[in-house]
Amino acid sequence: MSVEIDWDNIRGDLSVNQGVKDFLNSRLQEFELPSYVNNLKVTNFDLGTMPPNVILKQMDDPLDEFYSYLLQEGDISKEAAKDKNTDVQLLVELDYKGDMSIELSADLVLNYPSPQFMILPVKLRISDIGMHCLCLLAYLKKQLFISFLCDVSDPLLENDKLQVDPSGPNFMGKRALERISLIRNIKIHTELGQLDQGEGSVLRSVGKLEEFLVDLFRNLIRKEAAWPSWIDLDFTPEDPEDPEEEGRENDLVADSSNDGKDIEMKSGTEETLGAGIQESVQHVSPAVTSIDQESRVNSNTSLEE
């Protein structure tokens, strides 16, 4: 069963782009940068005009892990956790090959013949992001949990390649897929130097920096959104009488260290989900490339195309 998304409405909400930008910047601060890069930050995020293709595969009750998480966080009581009448979990196949883009800036540091011998401003643009995977969507207690399970075979993405700007022919080649790669195709355009100086000091396709960014973003997405981690979107209405909520905007916020925000990221450890994911995932999508034997999801109701 195909699912249509009102993409224009989503991308028209400026808080979405700003929220993702803030999330990426907050996570970039946690990474140790190599000696040749300083001041790396996201300057712009654009969802693009092309929505993902989403196919509903199965419908079921949410996993116990989601309820345990809400109980641990104090968001629900034990009595509320037993009431599952309005809760639902969807297993969907997500195929995205759109025009989403991420723009970054940084300082490229040349440490030869001496440390910080030269510092050049860098502008980067990440685009042509491709992903095809199975994803869990669980809605319970006014919160939406999103977790990616495994990649799905796709001839257009099988090379798992990194593309660079055509004017710079540096090609980084293939990379081995883990249980889930998520981002399986990326194009990066890089510029060095002050463009407004008019001195032609523009270099393109800096392989080292591009490879670092590809690894960084792939690892970031896997760490934050691939099972046993998930994205938690909280749609609980804010209490206007709560002084702690005063002044908070409805923008997406990606700092999981602050309670009450709209987006939280849960990074889990390798744990089992119960019996059945290998069989159920292979049943609904025989084209799945690989999935960790330790990750298992119960699925009872199948919605085939």
UniProtKB/Swiss-Prot annotation:
Pfam families: MMM1
Keywords: Endoplasmic reticulum, Lipid transport, Lipid-binding, Membrane, Mitochondrion, Mitochondrion outer membrane, Transport
Membrane topology summary: Peripheral membrane protein
Domain SMP-LTD: from-to ranges: 1-236
One BP annotation, GO: mitochondrion-endoplasmic reticulum membrane tethering
Localisation per UniProt entry: Mitochondrion outer membrane; Endoplasmic reticulum membrane
Compositionally biased region (Acidic residues): 235-248
Biased composition (Basic and acidic residues): 258-269
InterPro entries: Mdm12, MMM1_dom, SMP_LBD
Polar residues composition-biased segments: 279-305
Subunit-structure text: Component of the ER-mitochondria encounter structure (ERMES) or MDM complex, composed of MMM1, MDM10, MDM12 and MDM34. A MMM1 homodimer associates with one molecule of MDM12 on each side in a pairwise head-to-tail manner, and the SMP-LTD domains of MMM1 and MDM12 generate a continuous hydrophobic tunnel for phospholipid trafficking.
The protein's role, per its UniProt record: Component of the ERMES/MDM complex, which serves as a molecular tether to connect the endoplasmic reticulum (ER) and mitochondria. Components of this complex are involved in the control of mitochondrial shape and protein biogenesis, and function in nonvesicular lipid trafficking between the ER and mitochondria. MDM12 is required for the interaction of the ER-resident membrane protein MMM1 and the outer mitochondrial membrane-resident beta-barrel protein MDM10.
Protein name, UniProt field: Mitochondrial distribution and morphology protein 12
